[in-house]
Amino acid sequence: RGDFIKLTIPFYSTNSEIGNPELPSISKLISVPTGSDIEIKILNKVSKKIILSEYNIKNQIFPHQPSISKSALAEEIKFHINDNVYKKDDFINEKIFKTEMLGKMREVQLARLIISPYSYNPVKQELEIITSLELEVKFVSEKNSNLNSSYYSPEFDHLYKKCINYLPPSPEDIITTYPTKYVIVSDPLFQSSLQPFIEWKTKKGFQIIEAYTNDPNVGTTTSSIKSYVQSLYNSATVNDPAPTYLLIVGDIAQIPSFSGNSGSHVSDLFYCEFDGNGDFYPEMYYGRFSGNTVDEIENQIEKTLTHEKYLFTDPNFLDDIVLVAGVDGAYAPTYGNGQINYATDNYFNIAHNLTIHNYLYGSGTPITSDMPQASASIISNVSEGTALANYTAHCGYNGWGDPSFNSSDVTTLQNYNEYGLVISNCCLPNKFDEPECFGEALLRVENKGAVGHIGASNNTYWDEDYWWSVGNTSNITANPTYSGTGLGAYDSWMHENGEHEDDWFITQAQILHAGNLAVTEAGGAEEYYWEIYHLMGDPSLMPYVG
């Protein structure tokens, strides 16, 4: 269809309809007081017009395209353009501001505030830009409620802080006032094996609630188990707050999973969604020790205890990081390399005394991901022990696609007592309704593999995985900057750029939630992402780096 131009601005995303000119907008999360309506009034506005031809710009603005699934073939990708819109001699714009009510997370009502300061006339090639805007946001009919004190958890403040207007409770005596409850739902087969894990978590200060499926109050179905967990949540009081963590112990034959609402996939999300009338924002952090046998569960328990107690024979492996932008001729040069470059530029580098095993696509590293030796080299790096291994591109349920690293390779690993977190931003690596997915293989293997695996139970998308890792931005580039993006999973985990302590996401489940919340802020396929991204491992574990 010819050439177009793109408007990209740091921190901006887009709110344009598919096929319409892609105009930058600002998208921020806000918290809405219980029972209130939102009123927004413009107090001051300054704008100006720009004639693009005066800047020697003759091409029209690029039409907004849907995010592309990482499972899509190049020949299947359709170009979207609304020709009638591009023929209009009039300014095309979204509302200057609008709010979208989202859902609740532990009784905090979330909404998205979108500000669209750009209008565009595609015939005259003119832009109208709001250069200064002052808004007044009021919450009308606000009701007083002490629900938050019953459901408040300091470990969720990290999520609420994503809302630009969130005010936390008084910090006085937070640890003693708001104890952290940890619920374990397990097949009774694993009750004895879980006791060392429970003893350790109790020593750490968690209040552990054990629930086994042979208890009629718990049961063996998704509905009965959810009803039990929800009863713990709903019965919360100021002096006995709602639980924060859920660990599911067993494969789907022992503890079944839900079917997703936004696609055909398994999802544990709904065990932890209670207060949003069917929304998709969890009220608890959750993870799964997936296993069918006592040995498979005990292997995960032992690795978790070894990691948390820092019982490594040689902890030097925690200095090693593996980062891979997998093979894709169309998207890897920008999306894949951009994600990995952001990680190495900001966090995982020599300046942090880390040893980086970096695999960019095409060029830029000693071994690029499209070289024949890449697969063997990556497997060797992991086999020698890594604090983090992160891959973005194509996968199947049994592992990374190209370069290949899959479940059969896990059995050959030699990283005994040297295992960390693996993050797979790709399709299906945590599809745990298969006999054994990649995440399950990494966790179940004895004394090697990984202590945690974050990945999806269905196909993922290029835009959303980029936002998940790097943060919300419309400027998807091979060299993103911290100043040009919102907070993604990397930033929230590593917290080295002056982020307030409340913005630190340091447990395995918090890292996952930070990525999903970046997708929510961007306005991407958020329901789908909250449903498909899962943690195999202990949700409260804080993975070491360095």
Model-derived regions: residue spans:
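Cysteine-dependent hydrolase recognition
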Residues: R1-G546
